[in-house]
């Protein structure tokens, strides 16, 4: 199955993607992760991307789509893929569609995890992270010892972009950028809205009911 995953900051997209990766044995492809991997490994596209990133500029669409195309050509993508973080604009969606058809892996469904703004603010304001990669929530998933990571014992910290004023700006920006894509995929009959409020297991079950149609 070939899937694109949308969801605002704090919607639990990463959590669901991790579980879907395990359940369906299709790789979770985060464009940010694969871009950083290409830069780290010094690939041709990675060097090209680094040139823009070092200058604080956005990586051009043609470089991003090249990185995605190369990742989809890897053997673990044969059963399908779960693409996260791309597209972000309708021109990117058009370019992605062309590439996916060209390589014989056309998009089958776009999942949009939908959560109300106030719920997202509550979720994100309580989020604390560790340098080891672990993430906690002071209300929903607190560490055993206050402000200390269960996994490695290091102090937890709150990212600047998890503070309320910044969160609201991020949500406004997300809606402004993503709404045209929601309409774009809705018109193509590919969009499925998922209620992202409530228990993680229930949300996962709802997603699986949708994706099982594409197995």
Curated annotation (Swiss-Prot):
Q: Which InterPro entries match?
A: Adenyl_kin_sub (IPR006259), Adenylat/UMP-CMP_kin (IPR000850), Adenylat_kinase_CS (IPR033690), Adenylate_kinase_lid-dom (IPR007862), P-loop_NTPase (IPR027417)
Which reaction is the catalytic activity of this chain? AMP + ATP = 2 ADP
Q: What class of enzyme is it?
A: transferase
A GO term for molecular function: adenylate kinase activity
Where does the record locate the signal sequence feature?
A: none
Primary location group:
cytoplasm
Which positions does UniProt annotate for AMP binding?
A: 31, 36, 57-59, 85-88, 92, 159, 170
Region spans: LID: 126-162
Provide this UniProt record's keywords sorted from A to Z. Answer: ATP-binding, Cytoplasm, Kinase, Metal-binding, Nucleotide biosynthesis, Nucleotide-binding, Transferase, Zinc
Q: Which residues does the annotation say bind ATP?
A: 10-15, 127, 135-136, 198
Q: What does this protein do?
A: Catalyzes the reversible transfer of the terminal phosphate group between ATP and AMP. Plays an important role in cellular energy homeostasis and in adenine nucleotide metabolism.
Oligomeric and partner information = Monomer.
Comment, domains: Consists of three domains, a large central CORE domain and two small peripheral domains, NMPbind and LID, which undergo movements during catalysis. The LID domain closes over the site of phosphoryl transfer upon ATP binding. Assembling and dissambling the active center during each catalytic cycle provides an effective means to prevent ATP hydrolysis. Some bacteria have evolved a zinc-coordinating structure that stabilizes the LID domain.
PANTHER family documented for this protein: NUCLEOTIDE KINASE (PTHR23359)
The protein's name is: Adenylate kinase
Q: Which organism is it from?
A: Methanococcoides burtonii (strain DSM 6242 / NBRC 107633 / OCM 468 / ACE-M)
